[in-house]
Amino acid sequence: MGDIAATRLGFMAELAQQRWDDHRYYHHSRINQSLHLLSALSFLTGYVLLFFAPAMAALVCWLVGMLSRQSGHFFFEPKGYDHVNDASHEHKEAIKVGYNLHRKVVLMAIWAATPLLLWADPSVLGLLPPPIDAMSWLNNLGWLWIAVGVGGLLYRTIQLFFLRDVQTGLVWFTKILTDPFHDVYLYHRAPLFLMKGQLIDPDVAKR
């Protein structure tokens, strides 16, 4: 019983640490934080849609959630030396548990290429019903994007099993699925600070 409790405590402690490291290293920009708030709200909407319109959920999560989220990282997050955490951009990229910028480029390229696959083979080797109109084509695209999202999540999780350990992979998996809830909690005030002209979070290193 004690071992089980210790394992659970270790899991939750690592989840808190992964969340803290992700925030303090990769979310200095108030614009990035605000875009993460938009992304989080989009993903929460997608979670609801998933129960009765899964393909539409994928369209919302990718087109709004992922694009806003990743544009924040690529275009607005500082890439210079991080004096707050005493770490170079290269170091932060190297220690990133999940998808660093390089891995994100690969994932987003795969996502962007899926419409070409659907254009070349509308039924995707017979896995999807041939589209008869624009809505059915978008429905098929949504299912492809679900496959890309689930595949990307499982790929990195299993990769972490071997690069780190099983718990790290499972913690990261849990973190990704619960990030929308946590991001709303963390960044709900970011747009207000941004409207006041604050571009960088001065308290990013404070718990």
Q: Where do the PLM segments sit?
A:
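Hydrophobic alpha-helical membrane-embedded segments
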Residues: 48, 52-77, 150-163
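Membrane interfacial helix-start motif at the N-side
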Residues: 17-47, 93-107
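Alpha-helical transmembrane segments of eukaryotic organelle membrane transporters
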Residues: 38, 42-45, 64-75, 105, ...
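C-terminal halves and exits of single transmembrane alpha-helices
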Residues: 99-123, 185-192
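Alpha-helical transmembrane segments and their membrane-interface junctions
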Residues: 110-130, 197-207
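Alpha-helical transmembrane segments
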Residues: 45, 112-119, 148-156
